[in-house]
């Protein structure tokens, strides 16, 4: 066994050493015609001789049969590939077995022939495509180099265009902040009423009066509605008291006098009759006789609140010039007081008639004598202070009008103080109205 293995090894080594070294550029062909065609296509100008046949003749028969079997399947590969060596393939079929044996090593290298023939054909389109691709790449690079510059310019322009957009967004945010701060304005005014006015704040209010108009107009309307409701309630109260007097006792008549005389100064009617305007002294005299002491305090409070009602509407000052707003405020107050005064003037004669009818109806003689005695006294007292009360009412209304030109620089501080006073006055008026209604019900 060892001998056989050594023999086979030596045969293999001899066959390997006998094989020619295949060149990458030249393929050896069995025919001379094929050699001539190859020479025209190869780079080498010299003809290539076939490999020597001596070592192959010395080979044993086993290697020859193996090589012959290997050559048979490889021949169709040579014929299958189209090449100018196809006419040489026909004489190759007539070659003897010895030539096949001798060309066996050449046939092993035969697959390199079509590769060599196709390589230049493939290289040509590759070479043609290479410059085209190079041109395309150059164009792309040129475009990419040009495009960044073109893109950089719009970016620069965009950056320049976006710069003015930032203030617009800030303006919108400022508008939202102003809208959010509007409901907090009364709180700020109430707190700063105690502090001295800052001219910068006044200038800011003068510059931007438009967005503040709706809120302040609503507040003014609310105040006016409250005043109208109070006037209507005051006008209805004497009528109710007049209806209650016919069935009441003479003592009730004196109470109705006191009620009428407490209510009349709250209206402070300028155009009403002197008896209606000067009811407060008669009320004090009647209350002194009847012993009703706590009502003059309410009366004083009511007169003070009515006198202070004129500057309540000074919250309109930022909406227009100072003098015009204050004059219009006085006119509005007069217009409001006129219907209230008319209703009071109508109610007072009716109450006097009811009192006159109630006094002689079923009252005892002493009380009946007291009531007529009180009437002439009230008339005497009314004639003297009637003009004084009317003049006082006119002066109270004329004071804010006279102060309007001189009070312009002090507008902001006065407005803030007036707002706080108006709030306090409204609270005191509401408390007084509740107390008066409770006392009348009792």
UniProtKB/Swiss-Prot annotation:
**Chain intervals with Basic and acidic residues compositional bias:** 55-67, 114-125, 133-146, 177-194, 204-240, 329-339, 408-442
Positions of region (Disordered): 47-442
Q: Which residues fall in a compositionally biased region of kind Low complexity?
A: 159-172, 241-255, 272-288, 357-376
Asked if the Swiss-Prot or TrEMBL record annotates the protein with the keyword Phosphoprotein, the reply is yes
Swiss-Prot/TrEMBL keywords? Developmental protein, Phosphoprotein
Q: Alphabetically, which GO biological process terms does the record hold?
A: gliogenesis
What is this protein's tissue specificity according to the annotation? Answer: Expressed in the embryonic CNS, in sets of cells that are segmentally reiterated along the periphery of the nervous system.
Residues annotated with Phosphoserine modification: 430, 433, 436-437
Q: What does this protein do?
A: May play an important role during development.
Protein name per UniProt: Protein bangles and beads
User: What does UniProt list as this organism's lineage?
Assistant: Eukaryota, Metazoa, Ecdysozoa, Arthropoda, Hexapoda
């Amino acid at each position: 066994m060892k001998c056989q293995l050594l023999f086979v090894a030596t045969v293999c080594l001899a066959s390997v050493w006998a094989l020619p070294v295949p060149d990458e550029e030249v393929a050896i062909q069995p025919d001379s015609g094929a050699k001539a065609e190859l020479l025209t296509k190869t780079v080498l100008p010299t003809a290539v001789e076939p490999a020597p046949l001596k070592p192959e003749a010395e080979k044993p028969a086993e290697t020859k049969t193996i090589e012959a079997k290997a050559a048979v399947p490889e021949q169709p590969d040579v014929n299958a590939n189209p090449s100018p060596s196809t006419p040489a393939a026909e004489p190759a079929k007539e070659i003897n077995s010895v030539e096949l044996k001798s060309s066996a090593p050449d046939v092993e290298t035969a697959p390199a022939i079509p590769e060599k023939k196709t390589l230049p054909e493939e290289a040509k389109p590759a070479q043609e495509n290479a410059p085209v691709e190079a041109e395309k790449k150059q164009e792309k690079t040129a475009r990419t180099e040009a495009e960044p510059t073109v893109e950089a310019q719009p970016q620069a322009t965009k950056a320049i265009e976006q710069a003015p957009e930032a203030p617009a967004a800030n303006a919108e945010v400022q508008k939202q902040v102003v809208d959010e701060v509007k409901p907090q304005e009364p709180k700020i005014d109430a707190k700063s009423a105690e502090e001295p006015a800052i001219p910068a704040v006044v200038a800011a209010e003068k510059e931007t009066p438009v967005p503040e108009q709706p809120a302040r107009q609503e507040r003014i309307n609310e105040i006016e509605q409250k005043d109208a409701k109070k006037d209507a309630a005051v006008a209805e109260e004497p009528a109710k008291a007049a209806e209650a007097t016919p069935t009441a006792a003479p003592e009730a008549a004196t109470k109705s006098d006191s009620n009428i005389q407490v209510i009349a100064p709250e209206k402070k009617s300028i155009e009403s009759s002197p008896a209606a305007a000067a009811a407060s002294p008669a009320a004090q005299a009647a209350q002194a006789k009847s012993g009703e002491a706590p009502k003059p305090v309410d009366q004083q409070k009511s007169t003070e609140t009515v006198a202070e009602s004129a500057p309540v509407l000074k919250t309109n000052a930022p909406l227009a010039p100072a003098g015009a707003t204050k004059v219009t405020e006085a006119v509005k107050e007069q217009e409001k007081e006129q219907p209230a005064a008319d209703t009071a003037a109508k109610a007072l004669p009716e109450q006097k008639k009811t009192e006159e009818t109630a006094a002689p109806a079923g009252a005892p003689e002493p009380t009946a004598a007291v009531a007529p005695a009180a009437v002439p006294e009230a008339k005497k007292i009314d004639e003297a202070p009637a003009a004084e009360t009317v003049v006082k009412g006119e002066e109270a209304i004329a004071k804010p009008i006279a102060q309007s030109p001189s009070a312009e620089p002090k507008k902001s501080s006065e407005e803030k103080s007036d707002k706080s006073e108006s709030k306090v006055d409204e609270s005191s008026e509401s408390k007084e109205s509740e107390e008066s209604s409770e006392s009348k019900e009792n």
